[in-house]
């Protein structure tokens, strides 16, 4: 009799949970329509993989790319709509979140063409690769719209788990296995630190988990200036620091960049930073509103260390991917300037503008590295010597992307840094801006050193890799080259007429 009553209670509870979930999905599902498109694309990939013996590669790429493009289109149609909070406060839709979601989708859309020829040449499993990329994209999108501590913790874990699997995708490569192990261990540690910081925030606010409710809870409990909030700030900064990879939380970055497949590195180098920047901005600006001086100081220290160490160590690197790893550490230092400035002096607008340019510059550089690696089997910087004599198109494309990363006029990177540093100067961050300018000059040095190697015509400096280089025609149907052309154009032309981009970025207040 007791078992019968318990069974009935279990059925009733399960029915209530199911009905509540159905109600949320029915009435709030439209707010996550771009994410639903990606979920539908994932289901289609799984169906094709499980029902078809002969994998139809073009269809798999078509479904993945189409779902990403449709998600972007949906976001564009929703632009300028009223901010909405859905799923019982777990998810927020506004212009600020949507522009970061757009950047993540753009990264994934450009990264998939980069992986086509690479996967075919290395004979890696295709369906799983695309599933991991789309799932990581989905996690990044949910992180951008997350409005409570639980979602902010779960969404990056979805992204991180796929990142671990992607970084170790070439199982036979010892470097890839080593990179995955370090990435997994440090990722697990950082997640533990992050959730510990959340627990302090949760307790100090009287048991609130929504970001805005945490602020109200801190006011009600009079704990907004307590030591507990300072402890929470330190732990959360360390946890988020792993995702952003500023110094000194950068130890995993060079090894993961060097050991992972190059298209995976291209994907992780931009999407993780975009998603983490969106999350960091909301966490620091809303729950830690009363501790702005403290988190400003913490981020200033991280920015200074990142800009100096990242660019100094990059000079000594011999691997192109490790050099870009340390370069990305320096680049995140520039982005942190925009986070510190905030909305008062267009800090977020300058950060978003620079991130848009950084995506094109970085992915363009990695597209060139993927092409060169497939044709020569190396990523050593010395082996690029004399590439211009064999493939002028690839050499010029790589040179333009590197110069744009360095911030030389009139390329997009120059105008992005100019806007970012100007906003920092207006906000009174004179030391950060001066260090940013000096380290930008330093970065130009090691970028120019590579370009000098590309353009050399001395036979004694040209390595066997370039002598045996197989040049492809300019009008090739290679998807990597098409993606590279798009990124190179986006790294050069938009900087000259960036007023519309700035206007859109300025319309992202939350």
Curated annotation (Swiss-Prot):
Q: Which InterPro entries match?
A: NADH-Q_OxRdtase_suN/2, ND/Mrp_TM, Ndh2_N
**Lipid bilayer topology:** Multi-pass membrane protein
Q: Where are the transmembrane segments?
A: 28-48, 57-77, 99-119, 124-144, 149-169, 183-203, 227-247, 295-315, 323-343, 354-374, 395-415, 418-438, 484-504
What gene name is listed for this protein? Answer: ndhB
* Location of the protein in the cell: Plastid, Chloroplast thylakoid membrane
* Gene Ontology terms, MF aspect: NADH dehydrogenase (ubiquinone) activity; quinone binding
Where is it chiefly localized?
plastid
What PANTHER family is this protein classified in? NADH DEHYDROGENASE
Decide whether keyword Transmembrane helix is in the record.
yes
* Name by which UniProt lists this protein: NAD(P)H-quinone oxidoreductase subunit 2, chloroplastic
Instruction: Name the protein family.
Output: Belongs to the complex I subunit 2 family.
GO biological-process terms attached to the record: ATP synthesis coupled electron transport; photosynthesis, light reaction
The role this protein plays is: NDH shuttles electrons from NAD(P)H:plastoquinone, via FMN and iron-sulfur (Fe-S) centers, to quinones in the photosynthetic chain and possibly in a chloroplast respiratory chain. The immediate electron acceptor for the enzyme in this species is believed to be plastoquinone. Couples the redox reaction to proton translocation, and thus conserves the redox energy in a proton gradient.
Per the record, what are the reactions this protein catalyses?
Answer: a plastoquinone + NADH + (n+1) H(+)(in) = a plastoquinol + NAD(+) + n H(+)(out); a plastoquinone + NADPH + (n+1) H(+)(in) = a plastoquinol + NADP(+) + n H(+)(out)
Subunit field text = NDH is composed of at least 16 different subunits, 5 of which are encoded in the nucleus.
**Pfam families, sorted:** Ndh2_N, Proton_antipo_M
NCBIfam families hit by this protein: NDH_I_N, PRK02504.1
Keywords associated with the record: Chloroplast, Membrane, NAD, NADP, Plastid, Plastoquinone, Quinone, Thylakoid, Translocase, Transmembrane, Transmembrane helix, Transport
Asked whether the keyword DNA-binding is assigned, the reply is no
**What's the EC number here?**
7.1.1.-
One GO cellular component from the entry?
chloroplast thylakoid membrane
């Amino acid at each position: 009799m007791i078992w019968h009553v318990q069974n009935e209670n279990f059925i009733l509870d399960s029915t209530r949970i199911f009905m509540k979930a159905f109600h949320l999905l029915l009435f709030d599902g439209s707010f996550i329509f771009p994410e639903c498109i990606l979920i539908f694309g994932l289901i289609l990939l799984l169906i094709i993989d499980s029902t078809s013996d002969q994998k139809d590669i073009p269809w798999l790429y078509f479904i993945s790319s189409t779902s990403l493009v449709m998600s972007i289109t949906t976001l564009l149609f929703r632009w300028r709509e009223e901010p909405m909070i859905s799923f019982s406060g777990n998810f927020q839709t506004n212009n600020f979140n949507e522009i970061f979601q757009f950047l993540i989708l753009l990264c994934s859309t450009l990264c998939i063409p980069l992986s086509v020829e690479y996967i075919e040449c290395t004979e890696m499993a295709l369906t799983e690769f695309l599933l991991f990329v789309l799932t990581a994209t989905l996690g990044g999108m949910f992180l951008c719209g997350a409005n409570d501590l639980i979602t902010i913790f779960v969404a990056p874990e979805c992204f991180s788990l796929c990142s671990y699997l992607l970084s170790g995708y070439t199982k036979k490569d010892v470097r890839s296995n080593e990179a995955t192990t370090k990435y997994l261990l440090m990722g697990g540690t950082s997640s533990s630190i992050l959730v510990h910081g959340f627990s302090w925030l949760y307790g100090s606010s009287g048991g609130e988990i929504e970001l805005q409710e945490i602020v109200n809870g801190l006011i009600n409990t009079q704990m907004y200036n307590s030591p507990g909030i300072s402890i929470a700030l330190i732990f959360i900064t360390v946890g988020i620091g792993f995702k952003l990879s500023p110094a000194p939380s950068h130890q995993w970055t060079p090894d993961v960049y060097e050991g992972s497949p190059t298209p995976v590195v291209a994907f992780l180098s931009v999407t993780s930073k975009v998603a983490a920047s969106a999350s960091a901005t909301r966490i620091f600006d809303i729950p830690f509103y009363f501790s702005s001086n403290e988190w400003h100081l913490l981020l200033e220290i991280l920015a200074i260390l990142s800009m100096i160490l990242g660019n100094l160590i990059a000079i000594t690197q011999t691997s192109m991917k490790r050099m870009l790893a340390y370069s990305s550490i320096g680049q995140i230092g520039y982005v942190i300037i925009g986070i510190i400035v905030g909305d008062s002096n267009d800090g977020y607008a300058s950060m978003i503008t620079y991130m848009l340019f950084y995506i094109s510059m970085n992915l363009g550089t990695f597209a060139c590295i993927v092409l060169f690696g497939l044709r020569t089997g190396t990523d050593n910087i010395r082996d690029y010597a004399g590439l211009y004599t064999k493939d002028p198109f690839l050499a010029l494309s790589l040179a333009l992307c590197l110069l744009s990363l360095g911030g030389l006029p009139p390329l997009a990177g120059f105008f992005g840094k100019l806007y970012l540093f100007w906003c920092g100067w207006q906000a009174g961050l004179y030391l950060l801006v001066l260090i940013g300018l000096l380290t930008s000059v330093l970065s130009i040095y090691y970028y120019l050193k590579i370009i000098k190697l590309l353009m050399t015509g001395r036979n004694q400096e040209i390595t066997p890799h370039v002598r045996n280089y197989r040049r492809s025609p300019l009008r090739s149907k290679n998807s990597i080259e098409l993606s590279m052309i798009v990124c190179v154009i986006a790294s050069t032309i938009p900087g000259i007429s960036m007023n519309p981009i700035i206007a859109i970025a300025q319309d992202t207040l939350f």
